[in-house]
């Protein structure tokens, strides 16, 4: 599958820009008000007690700011942050090397923490609970375990699949926070802030047009901003207005709901070829020439979240919103009864 402009996971060229756009403090962070309020209390309490912050788990869809919040936590506490990810830590020794190099109060950020293998995960248990590292010396009957003290630290984990975390690991996080999709007005503020940092000229209506099509996700908003900037510099006077943003996003095949061509193809296939559904996932996969896992993990979540697709035991159903968005009338009483 080629990279989509509205893909919430990072593209390779996103990362350098994202690092420059990340907020450094809580008061710079836009959106996630409940999460921010909770963190402000927990961070201040940790400061007053001169203790490390309890271990924190962030979960939610990709691109909502989990890494940015980990950065904010380390900056607010005035400590260093060490970043890694679940798939990178292949052996227990890899994790042991990271843990033994931490300093008092440091933040260890593990992205995609649900992808840690079980052997590595078990090393984390005593490290999180007792700030100790169990090291096995020798093999066979002569093997023995020694305990190595670690400096107190804060583990910040991030996951898009909280249900895949084992209960023992999940229970060791003192703070668990879910990140929600952003509102349009919050995304407008993010677009405006990013434009200022990147030196992009955008007016209020132009920022709003980009925000509307960003699928509730800051990462997508920032990516669309950069692509619209390209269009504005080549086809306009370099300033992003509502009209320029609309023309650029149409050229990129991103409609007013933030759907791309494949999103619309999935909905139109269900409606036009299968009378609105229900249609099985394997049949739909063959009809749109896309792998089942890709449909379930990449395309369906947002369509379901926005109410354009229903997932039932009998298959997928297009909702009335899907008909209206595509400009297709509901063509039978059977379809009307579904909703």
From Swiss-Prot:
<keyword id="KW-0963">Cytoplasm</keyword>
<feature type="binding site">
    <location>
        <position position="67"/>
    </location>
    <ligand>
        <name>Mg(2+)</name>
    </ligand>
</feature>
<feature type="compositionally biased region" description="Basic and acidic residues">
    <location>
        <begin position="1"/>
        <end position="14"/>
    </location>
</feature>
<feature type="binding site">
    <location>
        <begin position="129"/>
        <end position="131"/>
    </location>
    <ligand>
        <name>ATP</name>
    </ligand>
</feature>
<comment type="similarity">
    <text>Belongs to the RuvB family.</text>
</comment>
<dbReference type="GO" id="GO:0005524">
    <property type="term" value="F:ATP binding"/>
</dbReference>
<dbReference type="InterPro" id="IPR036390">
    <property type="entry name" value="WH_DNA-bd_sf"/>
</dbReference>
<keyword id="KW-0238">DNA-binding</keyword>
<feature type="binding site">
    <location>
        <position position="219"/>
    </location>
    <ligand>
        <name>ATP</name>
    </ligand>
</feature>
<dbReference type="GO" id="GO:0016887">
    <property type="term" value="F:ATP hydrolysis activity"/>
</dbReference>
<feature type="region of interest" description="Large ATPase domain (RuvB-L)">
    <location>
        <begin position="1"/>
        <end position="182"/>
    </location>
</feature>
<dbReference type="InterPro" id="IPR041445">
    <property type="entry name" value="AAA_lid_4"/>
</dbReference>
<dbReference type="GO" id="GO:0006281">
    <property type="term" value="P:DNA repair"/>
</dbReference>
<feature type="binding site">
    <location>
        <position position="21"/>
    </location>
    <ligand>
        <name>ATP</name>
    </ligand>
</feature>
<dbReference type="Pfam" id="PF05496">
    <property type="entry name" value="RuvB_N"/>
</dbReference>
<keyword id="KW-0547">Nucleotide-binding</keyword>
<feature type="binding site">
    <location>
        <position position="63"/>
    </location>
    <ligand>
        <name>ATP</name>
    </ligand>
</feature>
<dbReference type="GO" id="GO:0005737">
    <property type="term" value="C:cytoplasm"/>
</dbReference>
<feature type="binding site">
    <location>
        <position position="68"/>
    </location>
    <ligand>
        <name>ATP</name>
    </ligand>
</feature>
<dbReference type="GO" id="GO:0009378">
    <property type="term" value="F:four-way junction helicase activity"/>
</dbReference>
<dbReference type="InterPro" id="IPR036388">
    <property type="entry name" value="WH-like_DNA-bd_sf"/>
</dbReference>
<dbReference type="Pfam" id="PF17864">
    <property type="entry name" value="AAA_lid_4"/>
</dbReference>
<dbReference type="InterPro" id="IPR027417">
    <property type="entry name" value="P-loop_NTPase"/>
</dbReference>
<dbReference type="InterPro" id="IPR008824">
    <property type="entry name" value="RuvB-like_N"/>
</dbReference>
<dbReference type="GO" id="GO:0000400">
    <property type="term" value="F:four-way junction DNA binding"/>
</dbReference>
<dbReference type="InterPro" id="IPR003593">
    <property type="entry name" value="AAA+_ATPase"/>
</dbReference>
<feature type="binding site">
    <location>
        <position position="66"/>
    </location>
    <ligand>
        <name>ATP</name>
    </ligand>
</feature>
<keyword id="KW-0233">DNA recombination</keyword>
<keyword id="KW-0378">Hydrolase</keyword>
<dbReference type="Pfam" id="PF05491">
    <property type="entry name" value="RuvB_C"/>
</dbReference>
<comment type="function">
    <text>The RuvA-RuvB-RuvC complex processes Holliday junction (HJ) DNA during genetic recombination and DNA repair, while the RuvA-RuvB complex plays an important role in the rescue of blocked DNA replication forks via replication fork reversal (RFR). RuvA specifically binds to HJ cruciform DNA, conferring on it an open structure. The RuvB hexamer acts as an ATP-dependent pump, pulling dsDNA into and through the RuvAB complex. RuvB forms 2 homohexamers on either side of HJ DNA bound by 1 or 2 RuvA tetramers; 4 subunits per hexamer contact DNA at a time.</text>
</comment>
<keyword id="KW-0067">ATP-binding</keyword>
<comment type="subunit">
    <text>Homohexamer. Forms an RuvA(8)-RuvB(12)-Holliday junction (HJ) complex. HJ DNA is sandwiched between 2 RuvA tetramers; dsDNA enters through RuvA and exits via RuvB. An RuvB hexamer assembles on each DNA strand where it exits the tetramer. Each RuvB hexamer is contacted by two RuvA subunits (via domain III) on 2 adjacent RuvB subunits; this complex drives branch migration. In the full resolvosome a probable DNA-RuvA(4)-RuvB(12)-RuvC(2) complex forms which resolves the HJ.</text>
</comment>
<feature type="binding site">
    <location>
        <position position="311"/>
    </location>
    <ligand>
        <name>DNA</name>
    </ligand>
</feature>
<feature type="binding site">
    <location>
        <position position="67"/>
    </location>
    <ligand>
        <name>ATP</name>
    </ligand>
</feature>
<keyword id="KW-0234">DNA repair</keyword>
<dbReference type="GO" id="GO:0048476">
    <property type="term" value="C:Holliday junction resolvase complex"/>
</dbReference>
<dbReference type="InterPro" id="IPR004605">
    <property type="entry name" value="DNA_helicase_Holl-junc_RuvB"/>
</dbReference>
<feature type="region of interest" description="Head domain (RuvB-H)">
    <location>
        <begin position="256"/>
        <end position="339"/>
    </location>
</feature>
<dbReference type="InterPro" id="IPR008823">
    <property type="entry name" value="RuvB_C"/>
</dbReference>
<feature type="binding site">
    <location>
        <position position="316"/>
    </location>
    <ligand>
        <name>DNA</name>
    </ligand>
</feature>
<feature type="region of interest" description="Small ATPAse domain (RuvB-S)">
    <location>
        <begin position="183"/>
        <end position="253"/>
    </location>
</feature>
């Amino acid at each position: 599958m080629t990279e989509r402009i509205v893909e919430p996971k990072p593209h390779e060229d996103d990362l350098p820009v994202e690092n420059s756009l990340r907020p450094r403090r809580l008061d710079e962070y836009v959106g996630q008000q409940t999460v921010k309020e909770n963190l402000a209390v927990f961070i201040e309490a940790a400061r007053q007690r001169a203790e490390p912050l309890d271990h924190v788990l962030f979960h939610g869809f990709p691109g909502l700011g989990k890494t940015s919040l980990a950065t904010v936590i380390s900056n607010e506490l005035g400590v260093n942050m060490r970043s890694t990810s679940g798939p990178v830590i292949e052996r227990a020794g890899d994790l042991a090397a990271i843990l033994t190099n931490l300093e008092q109060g440091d933040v260890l950020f593990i992205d995609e923490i649900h992808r840690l293998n079980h052997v590595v995960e078990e090393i984390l248990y005593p490290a999180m609970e007792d700030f100790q590292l169990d090291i096995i010396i020798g093999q066979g009957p002569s093997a023995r375990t020694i305990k190595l003290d670690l400096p107190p630290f804060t583990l910040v984990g991030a996951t898009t699949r909280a249900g895949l975390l084992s209960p023992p690991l999940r229970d060791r996080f003192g703070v668990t926070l879910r990140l929600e999709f952003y509102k349009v007005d919050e995304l407008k503020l993010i677009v405006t802030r990013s434009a200022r940092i990147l030196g992009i000229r955008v007016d209020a209506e132009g920022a709003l047009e980009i925000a509307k099509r960003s699928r509730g996700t800051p990462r997508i908003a920032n990516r669309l901003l950069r692509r619209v900037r390209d269009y504005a510099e080549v086809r306009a006077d370099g300033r992003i207005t509502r009209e320029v943003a609309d023309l650029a996003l149409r050229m990129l095949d991103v409609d007013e709901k933030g759907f791309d061509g494949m999103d619309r193809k999935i909905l139109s296939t269900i409606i036009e070829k299968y009378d609105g559904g229900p249609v099985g996932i394997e049949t739909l996969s063959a009809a749109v020439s896309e792998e089942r896992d890709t449909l379930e993990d990449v395309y369906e979540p947002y369509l379901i979240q926005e109410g354009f697709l229903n997932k039932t035991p009998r298959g997928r159903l297009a909702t009335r919103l899907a008909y209206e968005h595509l400009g297709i009338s509901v063509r039978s009483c059977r379809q009307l009864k579904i909703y």
